């Protein structure tokens, strides 16, 4: 009788050990916490408190590495309203369709960014586009993403003028224009380096 009890308890113990081991293995295979995971294509997820981004990548449906940028503001209908840059432009590079900021790889999962002001254009991103980023000391709260084909990057920087809506209601002009000036673009192993940003047009 005692032997049967011992065998019974040993069997129960082994079953529990196997069950716990299986659970541990399953949990290690689960994706990262919800704040860093997007679901199905087109689904919108919150990536920071009060801020969300739309996921639209058919190849990857699991973990998304968060960018090293501060994101502030509120979100409405799945749109990011304000992005605050905390890295310099020279710390950014683009290689094989992936944007890298300060050494962290950001997969092109964010396909739509919209600012709080209605005048800001909704900028669609995908892996086939080059993502340019710029910031301004005059507008420290602005981190504008601009897209364009890789081969047209230098031409765009030299010839295009990008517009921002007015940042203060008291301003007479509807928009403050940003002009690229003295921008040196070089490509090394697929990485794009920017020596200078742009200046505000007079």
Give residue ranges: language-model regions:
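N-terminal export/targeting and maturation segments
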Residues: 25-89
């Amino acid at each position: 009788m005692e032997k049967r009890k011992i065998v019974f308890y040993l069997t129960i113990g082994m079953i529990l050990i196997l069950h716990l081991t299986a659970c541990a293995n399953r949990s290690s295979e689960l994706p990262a916490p919800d704040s860093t995971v997007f679901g199905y294509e087109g689904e919108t997820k919150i990536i920071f408190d009060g801020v969300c981004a739309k996921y639209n990548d058919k190849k990857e449906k699991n973990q998304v590495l968060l960018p090293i940028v501060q994101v502030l503001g509120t979100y409405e209908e799945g749109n990011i309203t304000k992005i605050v840059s905390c890295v310099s432009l020279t710390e950014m590079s683009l290689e094989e369709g992936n944007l890298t900021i300060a050494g962290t790889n950001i997969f092109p999962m964010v396909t739509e960014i919209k600012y709080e002001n209605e005048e800001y254009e909704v900028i669609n991103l995908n892996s086939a586009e080059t993502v340019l980023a710029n910031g301004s000391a005059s507008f420290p709260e602005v981190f504008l993403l601009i897209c364009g084909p890789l081969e047209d990057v230098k031409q765009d920087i030299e010839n295009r003028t990008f517009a921002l809506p007015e940042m203060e209601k008291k301003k007479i002009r509807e928009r403050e224009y940003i002009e690229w000036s003295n921008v040196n673009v070089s490509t090394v192993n697929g990485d794009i380096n920017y020596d200078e940003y742009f200046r505000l047009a007079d």
